[in-house]
C-alpha cells in the first residue's frame, strides 16, 4: 500500500451539515404524533382516509410542540397525513391501521 501525505489546506473545504427534519412523525396503536422541530406560523395538517379528506387543522405550531391525531376513532383504513406550509407540502406519510 502506498502512503499519500497531503499538506496544506484545501481551497474549497467540504462542509456537511446533518439534515434536521422539520417534523418528526410517529405512530403508536393508531395514534399519530407530529413533533415540530421548528416553529411554523401557519401550518396546515390534513388527514386522508382511503383518499378522502377527513380532518383538517391549521395554526401556529411552536418549536418542540407535539400534535396528536387519534386515527383509531375513524376505524380501519389507509391514512395519509400531510403537513403544508406556505403552499408547500413539507411532510407526507402513509399508515394503515
List the model feature ranges, each with a label.
Residues 28-34:
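Structural beta-strand segments of beta-rich domains
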Residues 37-42, 74-76:
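Short proline/glycine-enriched turn/loop motifs at strand-loop junctions of beta-rich domains
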Residues 60-82:
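Short, surface-exposed loop/turn motifs with a glycine/proline- and acidic-biased composition
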